[in-house]
Amino acid sequence: LAITIAPSFFLLSALFVILQYSYSLIFKHISVIDILAITTAYFLRVYAGEAAIGYHISIWLSLAAVSLALFLAIGKRRAELTLLGPTKKASPANTRDSLSHYSEKLLDTYTAMFANSTFLTYAFYTFLEKPINRGFLFTGYGELATAVSDRKWMMITIPFVLFGIMRYMQLIYEGKGESPEKLLTSDGSLLLTIIAWIGSVFFVIYGIGG
């Protein structure tokens, strides 16, 4: 089925399956490599989507995707350590080999680093990306349409990304970030933020054209 969509989509899907098996058998037991493997899995999904729909992802959006993937992967590990806090009976060494090599301070540093990286690369994307100019609201208004569509309207989506990062970090330290996929859709605040972000992106691209 995957190869009928696009050869590149099939290749990325195959790599994703191989990575998942490799992670389960090997990578999840090796510190740092486990985080990079989770990150690569997220990134393969992004590029599989690109291959499926034929949309070219710009360099800044790619960097934002990589940073977000690292942020989610590290958040997953940090949440696991939070659950294994001093009041818990289990210890990192008894749950997964790689966790025994992570300290809270190290993962806190990683989390802050890639939270900042995610925000900055996305902000640069909104500032530097060329307007798409598909808007319909000002069609037929000549110079006004050009002036409006030339604005960097994608910047209005930045607050949603900022809030999403801050809210996700809060949930990580509450020990709720073990499964990023479930958390992104089960937490009401995050879900509303994602919906608002998607809505604002569609409005900017297909409404204003910026």
Descriptions of predicted regions:
Residues 1-53:
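Intramembrane alpha-helical segments
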Residues 25, 43-210:
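C-terminal membrane-associated helical module and adjoining short loops/tails
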